[in-house]
């Protein structure tokens, strides 16, 4: 009988960082808005104070995720991005939607580097390598768990693809990720129109069985650390 609040609503479809935070971790955003942003004065005390309040809110958001400099930088980056969007105003809205999406997606992934890096030095080294090159190819640990059984079967059926399976795995996971994030209805929207049928039950059972058979290990839920 409990109705849980929606927490994510296809955040990677966002056309701005401001919109991203209306779709990403919505319960945390609501908490910070009600308990930090509004008590600080919100947007009622002038433009400069509004910008400062935004920076404080996202600084706290970073610290909430972890007491480290990487999380602080991540939070301040998101705060600074939203201040910049406010300063830019309607001029940004006049840009084509595809360009606004690319800008937002690029920024989000840049900020995630700091979120996931063990320290600032590691984040800086990764960003430097991304600009200058020198990654040295795809690391095996990155793809070893992706579609392992499926590609083993593919290599048996078509040995000629064996030299390219690593690149095919990366292309498949990136393509599937983008497709899942950008194209179909998310689970929340899907449940609004979902009607159980024999076909949907069989499809769900097949996908569930495929997922179970594809297990390669246990991954700790990332938010267990927060």
Where in the sequence are the language-model features?
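Acidic, glycine-rich loop-and-beta core segments that form the ion-binding/anion-interacting portion
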Residues: 1-7, 11
